[in-house]
């Protein structure tokens, strides 16, 4: 039997006239939608990343106040295990869910049934209406993204019944705290308390609330739907931008190859601000697995925090609160060139690394080839350079679509000249970070001046009255060493235990111990050699004080012999420097408050016939000694960290060409070849000398080395 045709729609106002007179026309139809997952319900819906198991919906025609048929559909979940809360509230079982349809088929049925009901009611385009935002933003969109399903356009806009209710009844509690039951209670509606079908009572009550709200509507109700962004939009961020602290989160644990689009997909359903994904880089310019994400409002940020420990592939991602200042620090920039480069919308950014320094736009475009053209040709390339204009070997390229970017990525590790080029996906924030890092790095970083040295000579000698412990556990303490030596610990000199640190300031596994005599040092070595300490055997060998001091100052002592510290290696010029008259050093007041007076220069220098040379502890970036003295220090061990003076035996071999007054000389190692005098002087800007204190030039023995005289500084290049 053929069903009768649907009745014609009731006469209504002319749409053209209505749209002209009513700036906010009501929608033709509303689809009240309720859903549940196999896990948490209520405000925590979707926070546990469980699959959707139930959809209940009913159509409401606002103009005629008619309602359609109520529909309920189960959804087959991949993980059929139900939480106790869901099992108790729904009464469902794993067997009933196993016989249900998959999500894609349920969505097809939903579209067909809703279209039929809307046609029967004489409505037009319809909009979804839900109780809160969790169902669409936290459940449907993320699950569809995980399963690679394409949602209909109708799922990208909806009305939040709680927000519409709060708009008409602002005296109630906040929209976030409302529920279907509290809304019906505030309106004085009678609900069917006997309805025990899970989801049906909620939809019927929501329909009753909507019809009651429509009766007292002033034309503003159901006029501004919530929008779910379909695509993440890239864009630049300026250092001058003000970012609300309540809109930023930090995601940690991202795969190193993930892009901003991957991060946006992880937060699918939430509205990320334009250019709101900033991947963080480490000190080497590589991604560290973290990202800062900026959302359009605080409500989106709160929903993002509920995705803590959700999965991206096989990895779970941690989500924490962050600040707007952190986001601007990572994503913000000040370069107009970068702003113009990033001003093109809907572009895919790739980073090229390892370019030859002589490569130009023509070379890069030829490397990529005609099959993957760069947007704008040479204008779509951005080369990263040092502050002095030298190329770094990095560049960024823009591509119009994902297909062209994929074609360019196939050139990964392709050859350009004699070098292979690496290609990676990039983001606008990464462009800003890389450019900011190179633009802000000076030729010579200005470091805080180290403490001025206090001499504490080590007693030199060739007698092997010390022992060296090699192969110590890195966690070994002074107590472990004393326990390891046993009875020999009683023969240690006061303050005679010295731990050796590596270039990073961590224990190196070596230690030196000063014994009372050569005989006791030999006895300790014979008794303790290759004894076990914490599952490791330790070598104990005798050595002299001179050998110990050289190792502590940066040299090495191995089976092949003694290697001197770096400062004692052969150099182009003699290791002696003439000195000049010097006034008291100008030390800032804030610096003097940090250190004891004994660590600062005296008020006036005392003339001396000769000044011992200084040993340098290692590279110029090392501001600490590479040893630590324990077990209380004797007169022969340092009590503060600083530079060591040379042993007395080293003074006999040094020339005696010295001036009558000792000067404050500083030796700088690792200076860039392009550094000029201004770069050198900027390092010592707080330690100038008076102009009357240098009247002569320092004699040098190497013609290429020259002395430059400045109004307030001495510079020896």
UniProtKB/Swiss-Prot annotation:
Q: Which domain of life is it from?
A: Eukaryota
Q: Which family does it belong to?
A: Belongs to the ESRP family.
**Keyword terms, alphabetized:** mRNA processing, mRNA splicing, Nucleus, Phosphoprotein, Repeat, RNA-binding
Q: Decide whether keyword RNA-binding is in the record.
A: yes
CDD domains (alphabetical): RRM3_ESRP1_ESRP2
Q: Where is this region: Disordered?
A: 1-23
Q: Where is the RRM domain?
A: 247-343, 348-428, 465-545
Q: Outline what the protein does.
A: mRNA splicing factor that regulates the formation of epithelial cell-specific isoforms. Specifically regulates the expression of FGFR2-IIIb, an epithelial cell-specific isoform of FGFR2. Also regulates the splicing of CD44, CTNND1, ENAH, 3 transcripts that undergo changes in splicing during the epithelial-to-mesenchymal transition (EMT). Acts by directly binding specific sequences in mRNAs. Binds the GU-rich sequence motifs in the ISE/ISS-3, a cis-element regulatory region present in the mRNA of FGFR2.
- Biased composition (Pro residues) is annotated at 1-14
Q: Where in the cell is it found?
A: Nucleus
Complexes and interactors? Interacts with RBPMS.
Q: Mention any one GO cellular component term assigned to this protein in its UniProt record.
A: nucleus
Gene from which the chain derives:
Esrp2
Transmembrane residues, as ranges? none
Q: Which GO terms describe its biological process?
A: alternative mRNA splicing, via spliceosome; branching involved in salivary gland morphogenesis; epithelial cell proliferation; epithelial tube branching involved in lung morphogenesis; positive regulation of epithelial cell proliferation; regulation of RNA splicing
Source species, please? Mus musculus
Organs and tissues of expression? Epithelial cell-specific.
Q: Name one GO molecular function term.
A: mRNA binding
The name this protein carries in UniProt is Epithelial splicing regulatory protein 2
Which sequence positions carry the modification called Phosphoserine? 83, 563
């Amino acid at each position: 039997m053929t069903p009768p045709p649907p009745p014609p729609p009731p006469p209504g106002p002319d749409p053209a006239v209505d749209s002209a007179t009513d700036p906010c026309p009501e929608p033709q139809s509303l689809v009240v939608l309720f859903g549940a997952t196999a896990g948490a319900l209520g405000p925590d819906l979707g926070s546990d990343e469980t699959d959707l198991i139930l959809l209940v919906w009913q159509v409401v025609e606002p103009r005629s106040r008619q309602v359609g048929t109520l529909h309920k559909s189960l959804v087959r979940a991949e993980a059929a295990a139900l939480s106790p809360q869901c099992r108790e509230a729904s009464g469902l079982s794993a067997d009933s869910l196993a016989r249900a349809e998959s999500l894609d088929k349920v969505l097809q049925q939903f579209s067909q049934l809703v279209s039929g009901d809307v046609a029967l009611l004489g409505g037009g385009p319809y909009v979804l209406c839900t109780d809160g935002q969790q169902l669409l933003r936290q459940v449907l969109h993320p699950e569809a993204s995980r399963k690679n399903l394409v949602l209909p356009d109708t799922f990208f806009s909806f009305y939040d019944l709680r927000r519409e209710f709060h708009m008409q009844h602002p005296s109630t509690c906040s929209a976030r705290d409302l529920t279907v039951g509290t809304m019906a209670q505030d309106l004085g509606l009678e609900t069917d308390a006997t309805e025990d079908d899970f989801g049906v009572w909620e939809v019927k009550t929501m329909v009753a609330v909507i019809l009651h709200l429509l009766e007292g509507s002033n034309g503003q109700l159901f006029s501004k739907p919530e929008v779910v962004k379909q695509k993440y939009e890239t864009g630049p961020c300026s250092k001058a931008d003000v970012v609300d602290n309540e809109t930023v989160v930090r995601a940690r644990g991202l795969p190193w190859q993930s892009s901003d689009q991957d991060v946006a997909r992880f937060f699918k359903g939430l509205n990320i601000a334009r250019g709101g994904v900033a991947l963080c880089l480490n000190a080497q310019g590589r991604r560290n697995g973290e990202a800062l994400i900026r959302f359009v409002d605080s409500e989106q940020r709160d929903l993002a925090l509920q995705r803590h420990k959700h999965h991206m592939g096989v990895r779970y991602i941690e989500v924490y609160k962050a600040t707007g200042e952190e986001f601007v620090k990572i994503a913000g920039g000040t370069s107009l060139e970068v702003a113009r480069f990033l001003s093109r919308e809907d572009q895919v950014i790739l980073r090229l690394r390892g370019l030859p320094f002589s490569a130009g736009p023509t070379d890069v475009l030829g490397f990529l080839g005609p099959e993957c053209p760069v947007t704008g040709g040479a204008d779509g390339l951005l080369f990263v350079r040092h502050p002095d204009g030298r190329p770094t070997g990095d560049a960024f390229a823009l591509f119009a679509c994902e297909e062209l970017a994929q074609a360019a990525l196939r050139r990964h590790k392709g050859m350009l000249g004699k070098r292979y080029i690496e290609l990676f996906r990039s983001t606008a924030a990464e462009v800003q970070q890389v450019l900011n890092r190179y633009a802000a790095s000076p030729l010579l970083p200005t470091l805080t001046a180290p403490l001025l040295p206090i001499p504490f000579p080590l007693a030199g000698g060739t007698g092997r009255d010390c022992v060296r412990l090699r192969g110590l556990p890195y966690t070994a303490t002074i107590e472990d060493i004393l326990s390891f030596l046993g009875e020999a610990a009683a023969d240690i000199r006061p303050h005679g235990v010295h731990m050796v640190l590596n270039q990073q300031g961590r224990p190196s596994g070596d230690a030196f111990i000063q014994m009372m005599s050569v005989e006791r040092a030999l006895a300790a070595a014979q008794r303790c050699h290759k004894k076990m300490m914490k599952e490791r055997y330790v070598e104990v060998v005798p050595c002299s004080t001179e050998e110990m001091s050289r190792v502590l100052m940066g040299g090495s002592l191995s089976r092949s012999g003694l290697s001197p510290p770096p400062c004692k290696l052969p150099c182009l010029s003699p290791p002696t420097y003439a000195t000049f008259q010097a006034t008291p050093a100008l030390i800032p007041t804030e610096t003097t408050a940090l250190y004891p007076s004994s660590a600062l220069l005296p008020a006036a220098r005392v003339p001396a016939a000769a000044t011992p040379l200084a040993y340098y502890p290692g590279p110029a970036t090392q501001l600490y000694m590479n040893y630590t003295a324990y077990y209380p220090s004797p007169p022969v061990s340092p009590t503060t960290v600083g530079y060591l003076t040379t042993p007395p035996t080293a003074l006999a071999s040094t020339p005696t060409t010295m001036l009558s007054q000792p000067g404050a000389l500083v030796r700088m190692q690792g200076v860039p070849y392009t550094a000029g005098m201004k770069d050198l002087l900027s390092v010592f800007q707080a330690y100038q000398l008076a102009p009357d204190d240098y009247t002569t030039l320092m004699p040098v023995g190497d013609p290429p080395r020259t002395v430059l005289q400045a109004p307030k500084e001495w510079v020896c290049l």
